[in-house]
Amino acid sequence: MDVLFVAILAVPLILGQEYEDGEELEEDEYYQVIYYYTITPSYDEFGVNFTVDYSMFESENTVNRLDEKVEASETTISYETDRADHQKPVIEKPVTMEPQSPDLNDAVSGLQSPGPLLLSWALIQGVMYFL
């Protein structure tokens, strides 16, 4: 890479010099030399390792399991005023919601109607006709 960089910088400087005896090169006599080197790394020294680290997937599964197993205790709410004996405490259970996965039918519903498909096909055919 360094050789290519030096060659690109040095060639115009060498070819663009003015001669002392008054002889100058014409513009059509100029030429530029560029050397291209391709460096291909050798992988013979290193063993290829296609090991997949499953720890990320395991931690994702743990997080998903924790989301589903939310344990909440019952909550007692009493609306106390001066005369608390006339009111009964209200017991509410907390609502636990499981994470919802996207429904596959929602993704496929756009494919069930042929309208957009026919419109895009007609548009492509029209463009190809005019080209």
Curated annotation (Swiss-Prot):
The keyword Aminoacyl-tRNA synthetase does not apply. Keywords: Glycoprotein, Secreted, Signal. It comes from the Eukaryota. GO terms for cellular component: extracellular region. Its main location: secreted. Glycans are attached at residue 49. The keyword Glycoprotein applies. This is Uncharacterized protein C1orf54 homolog. PANTHER family: CHROMOSOME 1 OPEN READING FRAME 54, CHROMOSOME 2 C1ORF54 HOMOLOG. Residues 1-16 form the signal peptide. It holds the Pfam family DUF4634. InterPro entries: DUF4634 (IPR027957). It is found in: Secreted.
